[in-house]
């Protein structure tokens, strides 16, 4: 019998601390109150919040804009009433700018989107007290468990070797580098198959 992504997600969730629960949220949930999510982001990146990567455009603006995109989903980990981390993303549209400026250019067949081809993973974060508790792995598995896209793509800030290694363990491979927004550091684009 094969193990499904949903089965793997349940297995990982079973290994989390007893008080941690995983919850799923829609775009409407985030738009209704983006502040808890923005506060967690600002806490995680407090050491670098003045870098363009983290403040331009502001996280609240990015969250609410992304929450309106088709296929948006946010998966969160809560320890009791405390937000311990989250991952969110959405389905890339056919006119996506996600791949714009990617070097080296992987070619038109790679970057051409069609409905349901790619889910973009926009943000994965875990607050400091809950790191090294498998929450990131659980969020990743829970987010991807119900996705129907062919592949997933994520951007990892230059110098974040921990996340590059983690995504490699998730089955993602590097395809190039890109500046996601004007003035941001270079980010490594990683892509992994979902089917």
Descriptions of predicted regions:
Residues 121-126, 132-145, 168-169:
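Conserved acetyl-CoA-binding loop-helix of GNAT-fold acetyltransferases
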Residues 78-96, 194:
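Conserved donor-binding loop and adjoining core beta-sheet/short helix segment
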Residues 71-76, 86, 118, 123, ...:
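Short hydrophobic/aromatic beta-strand element in the GNAT-like acyltransferase core
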Residues 88-123, 182:
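Conserved acyl-donor/pantetheine-binding loop and adjacent beta-alpha core of acyl/acetyltransferases
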Residues 137-138, 151, 158-185:
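Conserved active-site alpha-helix within GNAT-family acetyltransferase domains
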Residues 64-76, 92-97, 120:
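A short helix-loop-beta-strand connector motif used in the catalytic cores of GNAT acetyltransferases and
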Residues 3-61, 74-83:
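Short amphipathic alpha-helix that is part of the acyltransferase structural core
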Residues 119, 145-159:
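Conserved GNAT acetyl-CoA-binding A-motif
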């Amino acid at each position: 019998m094969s193990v499904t992504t949903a089965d793997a997600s349940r297995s990982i969730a079973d290994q989390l601390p007893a008080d941690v629960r995983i919850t799923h949220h829609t775009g409407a949930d985030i738009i209704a109150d983006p502040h808890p999510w923005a506060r967690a982001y600002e806490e995680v990146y407090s050491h670098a919040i003045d870098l363009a990567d983290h403040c331009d455009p502001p996280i609240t603006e990015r969250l609410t804009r992304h929450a309106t995109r088709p296929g948006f989903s946010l998966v969160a980990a809560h320890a009791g009433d405390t937000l311990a981390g989250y991952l969110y993303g959405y389905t890339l549209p056919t006119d996506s700018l996600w791949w714009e400026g990617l070097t080296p250019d992987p070619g038109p067949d790679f970057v051409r989107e069609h409905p349901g081809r790619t889910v973009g993973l926009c943000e994965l974060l875990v607050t400091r007290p809950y790191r090294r508790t498998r929450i990131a792995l659980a969020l990743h598995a829970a987010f991807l468990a119900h996705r129907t896209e062919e592949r997933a793509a994520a951007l990892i800030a230059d110098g974040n070797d921990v996340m590059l290694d983690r995504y490699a363990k998730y089955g993602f491979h590097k395809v190039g580098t890109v500046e996601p927004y004007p003035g941001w550091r270079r980010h490594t684009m990683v892509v992994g198959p979902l089917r």
